[in-house]
Swiss-Prot record:
SUPFAM superfamilies: P-loop containing nucleoside triphosphate hydrolases
GO molecular-function terms, A-Z: ABC-type transporter activity; ATP binding; ATP hydrolysis activity
Lineage: superkingdom: Eukaryota
Domain ABC transporter stretches: 587-824
Pfam families assigned: ABC2_membrane_3, ABC_tran, ABCA12_C
Protein keywords: ATP-binding, Membrane, Nucleotide-binding, Phosphoprotein, Transmembrane, Transmembrane helix, Transport
Membership in a protein family: Belongs to the ABC transporter superfamily. ABCA family. CPR flippase (TC 3.A.1.211) subfamily.
Record's protein name: ABC transporter A family member 10
Listed Gene3D superfamilies: P-loop containing nucleotide triphosphate hydrolases
Residue sites binding ATP per the record: 625-632
Ranges annotated as spanning the membrane: 35-55, 320-340, 374-394, 406-426, 433-453, 465-485, 507-527
Membrane topology: Multi-pass membrane protein
Organism whose genome encodes this protein: Arabidopsis thaliana
C-alpha cells in the first residue's frame, strides 16, 4: 500500500465530489422525480385554470348584452361607449379640511360642520403673483346650477360637478353617476336645501349644492405641509383633514400660463387594478378660471364629456396562477428546504460526517461540495419551475422579466441553503428535522397568505415592520412571489425599472445580506461543533470548572500513592520521552485528562484521570474496562471529537490539541458500528477514503484491490455489490479495510470483530496482525480471546484511570498466581468438599458456590497439580462427583479481579 500524505483542499474536495456524484447517480430517479415536481404542480395549476374557465364561461350570461345593463357586463361588446360628464374627486363629508388641532390656518371652516355634514370642499392656490391667484380663485366655482334637458351634456359643462366615489379601471361607467350617492354642484355659496333632480338617460339622481373654498397659501412648502398633515399618517392625532386639490401658479401672468396640480391618489385600494383618477376636470377648472381672468366671464373651454374607446366582446379571464401564486409557489419552492435539511441531518445521525472527518475530510471541502450540490439541485428545480410554468402558458412566469425572476430565485435558494445548514446544527434526528421542516413549509405559506399578505396590503402597517417580518426567509419568499403576482395581474409584468416602486430592491438587499450573515454564522457553529465544543458556547454563562473538593483531592493523592508499579513505569517512560523527544513512538499520551462539567447540582465528572501511555509503531495496545470506565472518552479525544481538559497526546509527533487536521492524514478509525453508505459498493468506499489519504492513480487502485483481498471482499463480485446488501460480517470487514486503507500510522479499532462468526473472526485477526507491522493500533474490546490474540500489551481502565499495563502473560502471572478448582456435588456434600480443599491448601478461597457447584482459588505455591488429582480421587470414593475441573487463571479472571478491586477502592476513597 502507498504511504499517505496530507491531502490538499482540492484533493479532499475531489474525493468528496466523486463520492457524491456516484451516490447521486445511484439516486438518479429520486433526483429526476424531485425536479419533475414543479412540472406536476404547474400541470395541476393548468388543470384548475382550464376547469375554472369552462365553469365561468358556462356561467356567463351574454343574453343581456344590449340591454340597459350592458355597460355593467364586462364580457359584452361595447361599440358605442356612453358619454359621461366629467366629475371632480372630492373628499367624504367627514374627511374634509377643517380648522383646529394640528391645522394652524384660520381660513378653514370650523370643525362643527362635520356634525351636520355641511363642510365645504377646499382647494388651495399658491404662486408668485398673489393678486392673480385671488382673481383665479374667484373664477373657480359658479354661482348657480342650471341645466338644459335638450342639451344636457353641454349645459352640465357650465357647472362644476363632483363625486366622493372613485372611478374604476375604465370609463364605460362612472360610479359617481350610476350609484345612489349624490352628485355635488360645487358653488361659491349654497342656499339651504339646494337640491335639484337630474335625469341622465335611464338614470335618475339628484344634484346637491356644495360650497367650494379657494384659499391662498404663501408658497408650495406650506401647501405640501398642509397636504401631508391632512393625511392620517402625517399627524400625531391620526386624523384625516383632506384637501380636494391644490394649484401652484408658479410664474403665471397675462402672457404665460404655468401651473402644477396636486391631486389625491391615495384612495386606490388595489394597485394591481390601476384605477383611473379624476384629473382632467381639475385641469379644465383652472384653465377656465385663467381664461375668465384674461377674456371675461363669457370665455371658457367646455369640457362636455369623457368617453371610453369601443371594445369587442371579451371573455372573463380569472388568472388562477396570479391569484394563488404567492401561496402555491411559496410551498413549491420551500419544498426544497426539507430535502436539504434532512440530507444534512442524515449524515449527522448516521455519523457519516464524523467518520469522514476522522479520515481526513476538512470542514472547508465538505461545505464547498455540499453547498455546490444543493445550489445546483435548487437552481435546476426553480429553473424547471419557470420553464414548465412558461411552457404551459402561465402569465405569472411569462410576463415577469426572466432575469428579475432568476436573480430573485438565485438569492433566495442561497438563503434557503444557508438557513438549512444553520438549522441542521439544532437537529440530531432525521424524523424530528423532517416534521419541523414540513411544518415550517406549510405554515410559511398559510401565514404568508392570510397574515403577511394582509399586512402588505394594510396602509397602517409600517414598512419597518414588513422588513422585520421579511427576515424570516419564508416571508421574504412570499413577498417576492406576491409582487410577481401583482405585476403579472396588471398585464405588463415586473421589469427592472419596477424594483424600487414594488420594494423588491430592498427585498433583494435584505435577502443578500441575510444570506451572507446566516452562512457565516452556520459555518462558525459547524466549526465549533467539529472542534468538540458546543455550538452554543457563546450563549452559555462564562465560568470555569469548580475545583475539586478536599476529599476528591485527597482521593487523587491516595491514587497516586497507590499507583501500580507498571503504571508508574509507563508514566516515567512518557515523561522521559517528552524530555528527549518522541521519535519512533506513534502515540504518546502525556497526563491526558477529561472532565465533564457538572450540571443540575451534580459535581464534575472525571472521565479520564491523567493518562500516561506510550504506544510505539508496530504494537497493538488493547484497552479493557467496564462500561463507563472512560475508554470512549479517551478514544474521542484521540480522534478529535473531544478536546482534552488538560494534558495532551502526540501522534507521530503531532499535538492533538494543535495539529489534529494533520493527525487525520495518518490515522484510521474502525468504529464500533459500521458507518457506511448503503448504495455505495465496497470498492467505492475504499476509493473515497483512499483519495482522502491522498492516494492517486494506479497506487490508489492497487491499494483498494489489496484492501479488498485482505478482508476477503474481492472475489465473486462482492467488491462491486452495494454495501447495503452486505451481511453484518462483511460490513465489519469493510469497516476494518477502510481503517487500514493507505497504510495509516495510527489506527483506532472499537470492537472490530463484533458480530463475526468464528472463521471470519480468525481471518480478520490475521489481517489486523499483518497491518500492525508498521502501525500503532489501539483496540478496545470486551472479548478476552481477541485481546489475548491481537494485543502486544493490555491496559485495564477503571473509573477513568489506568490500573495496570503489560502483555497478557505478564498480567496473568501478576494477578493470577492461583489455580481455579471447580467441583459439582450434591448440596449436602458442599462442606466436605470445602474441608478437603482447605486440607491441601490452607490459604485457598472459595469464590463461588451455588446448588452444589463450588469454585475455589488455590495458590500455586501451596499445591502441586498431582495433589489436586489425588484429592479428587479420594472424594469420588466417598460420594458422587458430578463434575470437576482445574484451570489456570484466564485473562477474564485478571480483568474481573483488577476491575472489582479498583472499583471497591474508589468507592471507599
Amino acid at each position: 500500500m502507498a504511504d499517505p500524505s496530507q491531502a490538499s483542499f482540492w484533493a479532499q474536495a475531489n474525493a468528496l465530489l466523486r463520492k457524491n456524484l456516484t451516490y447521486q447517480r445511484r439516486h438518479i430517479w429520486t433526483n429526476i422525480r424531485l425536479v419533475l415536481v414543479p412540472l406536476l404542480l404547474c400541470l395541476f395549476l393548468l388543470g384548475i385554470q382550464l376547469l375554472l374557465d369552462v365553469v365561468v364561461n358556462k356561467a356567463a350570461d351574454l343574453t343581456k348584452c344590449g340591454s340597459q345593463d350592458d355597460f355593467s357586463i364586462g364580457d359584452c361588446p361595447i361599440p358605442n361607449p356612453p358619454l359621461l360628464p366629467p366629475l371632480l374627486q372630492i373628499p367624504e363629508p367627514e374627511s374634509r379640511a377643517v380648522s383646529g388641532g394640528f391645522f394652524s390656518y384660520n381660513d378653514l371652516p370650523d370643525k362643527s360642520c362635520r356634525k351636520t355634514g355641511t363642510c365645504p370642499v377646499t382647494i388651495l392656490l399658491t404662486g408668485n403673483n398673489h393678486s392673480l391667484g385671488q382673481a383665479l380663485s374667484g373664477n373657480m366655482f359658479g354661482g348657480s346650477f342650471a341645466v338644459n334637458s335638450s342639451d344636457l351634456l353641454s349645459s352640465l359643462a357650465y357647472n362644476v360637478l363632483g363625486s366622493t366615489l372613485a372611478l374604476g379601471t375604465n370609463n364605460y361607467a362612472d360610479p359617481g353617476i350610476e350609484s345612489d350617492f349624490p352628485i355635488y354642484s360645487i358653488q361659491s355659496q349654497c342656499s339651504p336645501n339646494s337640491t335639484w333632480p337630474l335625469s341622465f338617460g335611464k338614470i335618475h339622481t339628484a344634484v346637491t349644492c356644495l360650497q367650494g373654498l379657494s384659499l391662498w397659501r404663501n408658497n408650495s412648502v406650506e401647501v405640501n405641509d398642509e397636504l401631508f398633515k391632512g393625511n392620517w399618517k402625517g399627524n400625531p392625532e391620526r386624523m384625516t383633514n383632506e384637501i380636494a386639490a391644490a394649484y401652484d401658479l408658479l410664474n403665471t401672468d397675462r402672457n404665460n400660463f404655468d401651473v402644477t396640480i396636486w391631486y389625491n391618489s391615495t384612495n386606490i385600494d388595489d394597485p394591481s387594478r390601476a384605477p383611473l383618477v379624476r384629473v382632467p376636470r381639475l385641469l379644465n377648472l383652472v384653465s377656465n378660471a385663467y381664461l375668465k381672468f384674461l377674456k371675461g366671464p363669457g370665455t371658457r373651454i367646455l369640457f362636455e364629456f369623457v368617453k371610453e374607446v369601443p371594445k369587442h366582446q371579451t371573455k372573463f379571464n380569472l388568472d388562477i396562477a396570479s391569484m394563488l401564486g404567492p401561496l402555491f409557489f411559496t410551498w413549491v419552492v420551500l419544498l426544497l428546504f426539507p430535502v436539504i435539511l434532512t440530507s444534512l441531518v442524515y449524515e449527522k445521525q448516521e455519523r457519516l460526517r464524523i467518520i469522514m472527518k476522522m479520515h481526513g475530510l476538512g470542514i472547508g471541502p465538505y461545505w464547498m461540495i455540499s453547498y455546490a450540490y444543493f445550489l445546483t439541485l435548487s437552481m435546476f428545480y426553480v429553473i424547471s419551475l419557470v420553464i414548465f410554468g412558461s411552457a404551459i402558458g402561465l402569465r405569472y412566469f411569462r410576463l415577469n422579466d426572466y432575469s428579475v425572476q432568476f436573480i430573485f430565485y438565485f438569492i433566495f435558494v442561497n438563503l434557503q441553503i444557508s438557513f438549512a445548514f444553520l438549522a441542521s446544527s439544532i437537529f440530531s434526528k432525521v424524523k424530528t428535522a423532517t416534521v419541523v421542516a414540513y411544518t415550517l413549509v406549510f405554515a410559511s405559506g398559510l401565514l404568508g397568505m392570510f397574515l403577511f399578505g394582509e399586512l402588505l396590503e394594510s396602509p397602517t402597517f409600517p414598512e419597518k415592520g414588513i422588513l422585520a417580518l421579511e427576515l424570516y426567509p419564508g416571508f421574504s419568499l412570499f413577498r417576492g412571489l406576491y409582487e410577481f403576482a401583482q405585476y403579472a395581474s396588471r398585464g405588463n409584468g415586473m421589469k427592472w425599472k419596477d424594483l424600487k416602486e414594488s420594494g423588491m430592491d430592498k427585498l433583494f438587499y435584505l435577502m443578500s445580506v441575510e444570506w451572507f450573515v446566516i452562512l457565516i454564522v452556520a459555518y462558525s457553529i459547524d466549526l465549533l461543533s467539529s472542534s468538540g465544543r458546543s455550538p452554543f458556547v457563546f450563549f452559555k454563562k462564562s465560568s470555569s470548572l469548580p475545583s475539586p473538593s478536599v476529599q476528591r483531592q485527597n482521593s487523587e493523592n491516595v491514587l497516586i500513592d497507590m499507583e501500580k508499579t507498571d503504571v508508574t513505569q509507563e508514566r516515567e517512560k512518557v515523561e522521559k520521552l517528552r524530555k528527549e523527544g518522541t521519535t519512533g513512538h506513534a502515540i504518546v499520551c502525556d497526563n491526558l485528562k477529561k472532565v465533564y462539567p457538572g450540571s443540575d447540582g451534580n459535581p464534575p465528572k472525571l472521565a479520564v484521570r491523567g493518562l500516561y501511555l506510550d504506544v510505539p509503531s508496530g504494537e497493538c495496545f488493547g484497552m479493557l474496562g467496564p462500561n463507563g470506565a472512560g475508554k470512549t472518552s479517551f478514544i474521542n479525544m484521540m480522534t478529535g471529537l473531544l478536546k482534552p481538559t488538560s494534558g495532551t497526546a502526540l501522534v507521530q509527533g503531532l499535538d492533538i490539541c494543535k495539529d489534529m487536521n494533520k493527525v487525520y492524514t495518518s490515522m484510521g478509525v474502525c468504529p464500533q458500528h459500521d458507518l457506511l453508505w448503503g448504495t455505495l459498493t465496497g470498492r467505492e468506499h475504499l476509493l473515497f477514503y483512499g483519495r482522502l489519504k491522498n492516494i492517486k492513480g494506479s497506487a490508489l487502485m492497487q491499494a483498494v484491490e489489496e484492501s479488498l483481498k485482505s478482508v476477503s471482499l474481492f472475489d465473486g463480485g462482492v467488491a462491486d455489490k452495494p454495501a447495503g446488501k452486505y451481511s453484518g460480517g462483511m460490513k465489519r470487514r469493510l469497516s476494518v479495510a477502510i481503517s487500514l486503507i493507505g497504510n495509516p500510522k495510527v489506527v483506532y479499532m472499537d470492537e472490530p470483530s463484533t458480530g463475526l462468526d468464528p472463521a471470519s473472526r480468525k481471518d480478520l485477526w490475521t489481517v489486523i496482525q499483518r497491518a500492525k507491522q508498521n502501525t500503532a493500533i489501539i483496540l478496545t474490546t470486551h472479548s478476552m480471546e481477541e485481546a489475548e490474540f491481537l494485543c502486544d500489551r493490555l491496559g485495564i481502565f477503571v473509573d477513568g484511570g489506568l490500573q495496570c499495563v503489560g502483555n497478557p502473560k505478564e498480567l496473568k502471572g501478576r494477578y493470577g498466581g492461583s489455580y481455579v478448582f471447580t467441583m459439582t456435588t450434591s448440596v449436602e456434600h458442599e462442606e466436605k468438599v470445602e474441608r478437603m480443599v482447605k486440607h491441601i491448601s490452607p490459604n485457598s478461597k472459595r469464590v463461588y458456590h451455588l446448588a452444589g457447584t463450588q469454585k475455589f482459588e488455590i495458590p500455586k505455591q501451596e499445591v502441586m497439580i498431582a495433589d489436586v488429582f489425588f484429592m479428587v480421587e479420594k472424594v469420588k470414593s466417598k460420594f458422587t462427583v458430578f463434575a470437576w475441573g482445574l484451570a489456570d487463571t484466564t485473562l477474564e479472571d485478571v480483568f474481573f479481579k483488577v476491575a472489582t478491586t479498583a472499583q471497591a477502592f474508589n468507592s471507599l476513597s
